[in-house]
Curated annotation (Swiss-Prot):
GO biological process, alphabetically ordered: pollen development
SUPFAM superfamilies: ArfGap/RecO-like zinc finger, C2 domain (Calcium/lipid-binding domain, CaLB)
Record organism: Arabidopsis thaliana
Zinc finger (C4-type): 30-53
Keywords: Calcium, GTPase activation, Metal-binding, Zinc, Zinc-finger
UniProt keyword annotation of Ribosomal protein present: no
Entry keyword Plastid: no
C2 domain mapped to chain residues: 162-280
UniProt-recorded name of the protein: Probable ADP-ribosylation factor GTPase-activating protein AGD13
Length: 336
């Protein structure tokens, strides 16, 4: 169980307790695609999800994912307690995505239905990213058999949460403690490299630890405008965000169109030094300086803007003949 969810286990209105859990920073985005402001939940899995992912979860059947509306449906005490005990998206994803391979990217909010379906099935129904000792497999069987297996899996995972809550460790191979969330808005690219006959079909991939997120593909566009938000959980021991741009190819491997390491330490250090940003007016609180060994085009300023800690970043893509990228980062502490 995540530390900040522990206090939600006290008696009270079920819907109020669920709403309180939903308001935690890591639950403000969909557990599966990162879409903002999810209003649905899988009560037996313990995650908050968006409307599009909700449709896929429903198609899996209630024996795999029991979907409830946070605001419209009635929740039983058992369902509420289960959600509280798991602690929300960050805790659940550290289990269900513990062994997410580098070759598999989480879908973004705007992916097509087929991509969304493939990822969610692999994550929950096929259990492809679970720790091997938690996986439960069977041959072809009935829905009743599948329901039993999924129930057994849920019990094993819940037992693991209970056991590790007391020891303060949770699946050392896959579970980490998070210190906050990093919202990255990929704004636009400029003069990107040509990888097809006369253009490219670019998309951006972000990597942090075991997390891998990507934007939508922009067809035949060397100056794409995404304005797409991606949300990363930041562990206690973090490194730079690895950014890569690829050209999407239908019949062959996607071609690299440049890369860059984004140093997030200046943002996090500045944010933690000032504490609650809502106590301050708009002001500059830090800076990531341009140097010969980083991809910055200009110094990157860190500001408090409307009670939020944000950083504008303009980078020149590395190891490629041309291309620049503009993005914005925002820091969201877990205790916000």
């Amino acid at each position: 169980m995540s530390n900040y969810a522990a206090g939600l286990g006290k008696p009270g209105s079920g819907k109020r307790r669920i709403r309180d859990l939903l308001n935690q920073p890591d639950n403000r985005v969909c557990a599966d695609c990162g879409a903002s402001d999810p209003k649905w939940a899988s009560a037996n899995i313990g995650v908050f999800i968006c409307l599009k992912c909700c449709g896929v979860h429903r198609s899996l059947g209630t024996h795999i994912s029991k979907v409830l509306s946070v605001t419209l449906d009635e929740w039983s005490d058992e369902e509420v307690d289960s959600m509280i005990e798991i602690g929300g998206n960050a805790s659940a994803n550290s289990i269900y995505e513990a062994f997410l391979p580098d070759t598999c990217s989480k879908p973004g909010p705007d992916v097509n239905h087929d991509q969304r379906m493939r990822f969610i099935r692999a994550k929950y129904e096929l259990q492809e990213f679970l720790k091997p000792s938690l996986r439960i497999t069977s041959g072809k069987g009935s829905t009743k058999s599948s329901a039993f297996l999924t129930s057994s899996l849920s019990r094993k995972i819940m037992d693991s949460f209970r056991t590790n809550s007391s020891s303060q460790t949770m699946f050392q191979e896959g579970m980490v403690e998070f210190i906050g969330l990093l919202k990255v808005t990929i704004k636009k690219g400029t003069n990107l490299a040509i990888r097809d006959m006369m253009s490219s079909d670019p998309y951006v991939v972000l990597n942090l630890g075991k997390q891998k997120l990507q934007t939508t593909v922009m067809n035949s566009n060397l100056n794409p405008v995404w304005n797409q938000e991606l949300m990363l959980s930041v562990p206690e021991s973090y490194g730079p965000v690895k950014l890569q741009v690829y050209d999407y190819d239908t019949f062959s491997a996607d071609d690299i169109m440049g890369e860059a390491d984004i140093d997030i330490q200046p943002l996090i250090t500045s944010a933690m030094a000032f504490g609650d940003p809502e106590m301050f007016g708009d002001m500059q609180i830090g800076k990531w300086l341009k140097s010969h060994d980083n991809p910055l085009i200009d110094d990157s300023i860190i500001n408090i803007v409307d009670g939020k800690v944000k950083q504008e970043v303009q980078i020149k893509l590395q190891n490629v003949e041309s291309g620049e990228l503009e993005l914005e980062m925002e820091w969201l502490p877990l205790d916000q």
